A protein has these predicted regions:
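N-terminal segments that mediate ammonia production and transfer
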Residues: 1-195
């Protein structure tokens, strides 16, 4: 992809929309995407125009490249990553046999974080449906304790995996890169209950 912006003072083209938004402090709706087969031409007088130089082919974006490598601050990428996490919920529930009470949800920093939030929203929706079903099964006059037991259920999430930024910087500068690379990620001790989670 390529994105462009023009005003009275500047014309700019970049591979990612958020770079233009941040550098020039402009909103996303003022930035245009260059379409397949188009070229952005600027003459010596500074007049800008788009020209169709090739016949557009079928667009076949690589979903992995788009979701994983794209800048996460782009509004469309953010929505797609959240939706990806939400769409994982049925498979996750199947994998854990719907045992959310003994499951702690987390993510590997950094790219997966946004998908993680989408997954949590999907899990919250699932749990709310379960709560409604359980309350309805109690009948018309449930006790305070019965309601409290059902309503207190939560999706458990922790920041289990962390990135050791200091070690990552050290590895990038040092000669023992291969030996230390496995330790760039660490766990947050105490975030899980051994034998239970």
């Amino acid at each position: 992809p390529a994105f462009w912006y023009q005003d009275d003072e500047i014309a700019v083209l970049a591979s990612e929309r958020p770079v233009i938004q941040t550098a020039l402090n402009v909103s996303a709706d003022r930035i245009r995407e260059l379409q397949p087969g188009q070229a952005l031409l600027i003459n010596k007088a500074g007049k800008l125009r788009t020209v169709q130089i090739n016949k557009p082919r079928e667009v076949k974006p690589c979903s992995f490249e788009r979701i994983y490598f794209s800048r996460g601050s782009d509004m469309d990428i953010y929505k797609e990553r959240k939706l990806l996490g939400e769409k994982l919920v049925p498979n996750i529930l199947k994998a854990i046999d719907k045992d959310i009470d003994h499951t702690v949800f987390s993510f590997i920093p950094n790219t997966a974080e946004v998908a993680f939030y989408g997954m949590l929203q999907g899990l919250d929706d699932y749990l709310n449906e379960e709560k409604v079903r359980q309350i309805a099964a109690l009948g018309h006059n449930p006790s305070h304790d019965e309601l409290e037991r059902i309503l207190s259920r939560r999706i458990r999430s922790e920041k289990v995996a962390i990135k050791d930024i200091k070690l990552r910087t050290f590895i990038a500068e040092g000669n023992s890169r291969n030996d230390l690379a496995a330790h760039v990620y660490d766990i947050t001790y105490g975030s899980l209950v051994p034998g239970t989670d």
